[in-house]
């Protein structure tokens, strides 16, 4: 009998997948199965956690003009 | 700079999340092929990976797939006798 596991299928870019793998690496409580470069099966209760952490990571990687201006005037 | 922000927003938009069931650990490729074909015909197949013998169905389709597997395995057992 094959196994049936309840989860949430995530379809995304390889770069986003790498970020999710990174988020999972500390506790390994998010990813049920790494299906391929652009597909993941994750634990249903962890979808919101992943969404929040991704948003935070992506925001940190976004250019902040105010920060640059502060640096420039500091010189 | 503006282009970069747009790119990130686009990447967030490109993430799709769908509730479902992951079917795995098929006995052999024949079993995988039969069951995934059934799921496809039902229109409940979200994702398939024949190389790994794994596929994902919609939440609603999972029960019918489980019933199909039971029927299939029963048939195979009786034909072996």
Curated annotation (Swiss-Prot), chain A:
Which GO cellular component term is one of those annotated?
Answer: transcription factor TFIIH holo complex
Origin organism is Yarrowia lipolytica (strain CLIB 122 / E 150)
Write the gene name: TFB5
What is this protein's function per UniProt? Answer: Component of the general transcription and DNA repair factor IIH (TFIIH) core complex, which is involved in general and transcription-coupled nucleotide excision repair (NER) of damaged DNA and, when complexed to TFIIK, in RNA transcription by RNA polymerase II. In NER, TFIIH acts by opening DNA around the lesion to allow the excision of the damaged oligonucleotide and its replacement by a new DNA fragment. In transcription, TFIIH has an essential role in transcription initiation.
UniProt superkingdom: Eukaryota
Q: Hey, which family's this protein in?
A: Belongs to the TFB5 family.
Compartmental location: Nucleus
> What's a GO biological-process term for it?
transcription by RNA polymerase II
* Annotated InterPro entries: TFB5-like_sf (IPR035935), TFIIH_TTDA/Tfb5 (IPR009400)
Its main subcellular localisation, reduced to a broad class, is: nucleus
Q: What is this protein called?
A: General transcription and DNA repair factor IIH subunit TFB5
């Amino acid at each position: 009998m094959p196994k049936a596991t309840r989860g949430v299928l995530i379809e995304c870019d390889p770069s986003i997948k790498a970020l999710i793998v990174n988020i999972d690496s500390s506790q390994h409580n998010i990813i049920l199965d790494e299906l391929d470069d652009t597909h993941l099966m994750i634990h249903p209760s962890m979808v919101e956690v992943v969404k929040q952490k991704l948003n935070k990571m992506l925001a940190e990687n976004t250019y902040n003009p105010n920060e640059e201006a502060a640096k420039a005037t500091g010189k | 700079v503006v282009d970069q922000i747009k790119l990130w927003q686009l990447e967030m938009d490109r993430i799709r999340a769908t509730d479902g069931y992951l079917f795995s650990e098929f006995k052999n490729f024949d079993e995988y092929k039969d069951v995934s074909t059934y799921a496809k015909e039902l229109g409940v197949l979200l994702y398939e990976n024949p190389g790994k013998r794994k596929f994902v169905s919609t939440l609603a389709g999972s029960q019918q797939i489980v019933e199909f597997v039971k029927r299939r395995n029963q048939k195979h057992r009786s034909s072996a006798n």
